[in-house]
Amino acid sequence: MQLTPQQQALLDGAQGETMAKVVKTLVMYGDTFGAQRMVPVTSEYGHTVISFGLAVMKPVYDLYDRLIESGLTSGQKFTADPLPLDKHVPTSLLEDIVFRKIMYTQQDRYEQQLKKLGITADNAYTCTCYLDQVGNTPKQGDILSWAESSAVVYANSVLGARCNRNSGMLELMGSIAGFVPEFGLLTDEGRKAHWLVEVKCTRRPEAQLLGSAIGMKVMEDVPYVRGLDKWLGTELNDENRAYLKDFGAATASNGAVGLYHVEHLTPEAKQQGEALLREGYRTYIIDDAELERVKRSYPVIWKDPAAAPQLCFVGCPHLTLEQLKEWTAKLTDALRAQNRLQVAVPTVFTAAPAVLDAFKDTVEGYKLQSMGVILSYICPLMYMNNPLCKKKAVITNSNKLRTYTSARYYTDAEILDILTRKEGR
């Protein structure tokens, strides 16, 4: 790797041993993937995927102490992934003891570290940092040092920024150093598509299900999706951005997608079209039957597959303001149709703190809470990591949460039926 004189000086210890180790780590990372040089991080803000103070990760927090003691705060302010704990989310006494006395014993320490390292605000914890209410929205062409897979794939695909699927800690090191190795999705060639995905469904495909199918098929490759504009149109409005948020999260978690192109819709697909397809690309055709096949393939790992749901999570990734309002309208109509006032299953909707602040005082906010829905800022995955919570019959509309936990996936329509106890559910 060819370093600039300034970068070489940092590696040689010009700003101390700790900074030299940060740069050495980035150099080794780049060498692993064949990077020839470093490129500056150009986004206004960073984002860190580690937002939880797990006891087993104490060495990580010890390393962060060393960074702070060496004066190496982030070169850019940053947001962070969602917090793991919220007293409003249902837990038993024993579950709460496990959360606070066994699992997340480093939480207070870590949140104080993030303040010293440069987090933007006390409420800057969300996986959807790119939403307007949060304010960490990169521009097309910006070079990022992020790691959260759902945020990386959104920034690359919907915003046209450039970021690799980095690991936790490495992304913060990129923000501290101010540069990252250039390879993969930071390059023009690395952003070309290996797959042409033709969507031939007779109705708008469920975002989380379509993303799952594509992710499992292409894995870490870049897909170019054709035919989705039939259902979404050609404008990146609020509804479509929310759809692509959920779609992308499923591609990234059910596979390892860091970038997708949607013909006639996403920025680079609009600008370059079929030129994004690399020579020798493969084709994957998705129709209604293929989506149903994928859905049927999901394992049910509950101890009792016929158990009644005990808890429902909606919002992985975090919901947008528009999605909260849409869910409120759907639940209102569905409950009225069943002559019910409240949801039949304890239900938690998760969103960024700033989004929740904007929603709670609206008419829809009062309505949703009156229906028994709990609004929270947590990461559902962090909740499900509790071994006692894993034993619960938890349902979700998130394919990411299904993939990483014991939660059982249902489509939005199926979730509505379960929450309102529609006949047959």
Place the predicted regions along the sequence by residue.
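Non-transmembrane, aqueous-exposed alpha-helical and coiled segments at domain scale
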Residues: 1-425
